[in-house]
Amino acid sequence: MATFGAQTLGMDTTTSSSTGTFHLDIDPRPLFAAATDTATGVIAAVRADQLANPTPCTEYEVRELLRHLVGVMPRVAAMGRGDDPMRVTAPEVDGMADDDVIPAWRAAVEEAKAAWADGSALERTIVLPWATDTGAAALLGYVSEITVHTWDIAHATGQTPTWNEEAVGNAYGLIREWLPGVGRAEIFAEVRKKMGPAAAGAPDAFAEVAPVPDDAPIIDRLVAWNGRQP
């Protein structure tokens, strides 16, 4: 059972990830590895003249979104170690030199993978301001975030990466269970209360669902559920 904001959402889906659903007993670590591998390829292909490009994640330009991804990884590692991810001091990314982003990203990904090496972390209860769930579901939630931001960067820089269908499909299935299609403003108001001063002035993490056909590619359905128009 997962909780999101004031809502309680049952998670009992066990059908194919190609349809945008996920398995409760899936090990998300290979999916995390696949998502970060895709991200690494996209990040490495960004040119210097593209760093100021706007992205579909409207509060970030490409440069800022790259730094944001680096800053997310210590939270992923903290969850794997059993620490409170909201109390992690993220690396200083605001002024990170452009040439330092790729090595910092790669090092942070390896640290996160190592933190989840013990499979017992998948069964641990993880409490976040926006959800309470198993470690497996929480890690899969970050597969969703990493994939969506990878798409943001790819879209902003004219890249067409090959997506891992299993990773994207399971991430889409989870986020549909975690995040309702309506009432998001109210949900994030509750999340901000839980986050306290750290959330002051922050934009909604998810815009309203964008319309896409039911048979759209799974990556399009994932980003549309996260408020992007493919």
Regions found by a protein language model. Give the residues of each.
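Structured surface interface patches that mediate subunit assembly and partner/cofactor docking
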Residues: 2-31, 35-38, 45-58, 78-90, ...
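Extended, alpha-helix-rich binding/interface surfaces that flank or overlap catalytic cores
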Residues: 65
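Arg/Lys-rich, alpha-helical DNA-contact motif
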Residues: 73
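Helical hydrophobic small-molecule/effector-binding pocket
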Residues: 111-123
